[in-house]
Amino acid sequence: LAENQKNLRESYMDKIKGKARSWIDRRVLNKVGLYMAGKPVYPDFSEVDHVNPEDTQPVPGIPITVGLDFGRSPAAIFMQNVNDVWTVFSEVIGDNESAEKFAPKVKKHGAKYYPGFEFNFWGDPTGGDGQQATEETGFSVFLKYGMLVLPPTTDNNIELRRSSVEMVLNRRNGLKVNPMALVLRRGMAGGHHYRKIKGAPGMFSPSPVKGPYSHPVDAFENGIIGGG
């Protein structure tokens, strides 16, 4: 019996050796993951380590950071940093809508779920670019509704975005995501990924696939950098 247990342990270790945490979660621990024909942008994200078992509430007296991504598929991520632990509480996801339509939704969400809290808004630097039709920017539209949005960086540096999030993921208890932030969870679990290049084994696209999961993850990155 003891020999069988030893063999089982060795077989288990061989199975997971060199595998990404997301692979272990899906294949070995039977955790909720997202299958995709590509490579996750954040393979260190884990349902075990980074998702709260139930929704939690923000700590009073500490501002809530809101990460924003603009465009026709906008996203807002409500989060808070307490003692170097980031907690994502909720999200607002837009569908083929302008900043003019999205901004009131974000303001209403904040007032409903986090009354009395101060908010710090951080948005993609391209949110300062005018729209062809109106010349209004995402920043100016949000300001019209009483929300001052600042850019977390001046040049939208990709390496800075990735390294900032990876630092949080690799820090002990660095990130906790509430279950209600479902789209962000799916994005971090692999929905936000690099596409596999056909006919080139082991090769992936240099940039992540743009889709329903990329926008909330981009908003999350903006919040991490701006609020960090």
Predicted features by range, described:
Residues 1, 30-32, 80, 90-92:
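Short, structured patches in soluble enzyme cores that scaffold and shape functional sites
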Residues 2-68:
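ATPase catalytic-site recognition across NTP-hydrolyzing enzymes
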Residues 52-55, 63-66, 76, 107-110, ...:
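Generic recognition of flexible, low-complexity loop/linker segments
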Residues 64, 74, 119, 217:
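Residue-level detector of short, conserved catalytic/binding motifs and their immediate flanks
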Residues 74-80, 221:
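Short beta-strand scaffold segments in enzyme catalytic cores
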Residues 82-209, 228:
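Mg2+-dependent endonuclease catalytic cores in nucleic-acid-processing enzymes, primarily RNase H-like
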Residues 208-228:
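Acidic, Mg2+-coordinating catalytic module of metal-dependent nucleases/exonucleases
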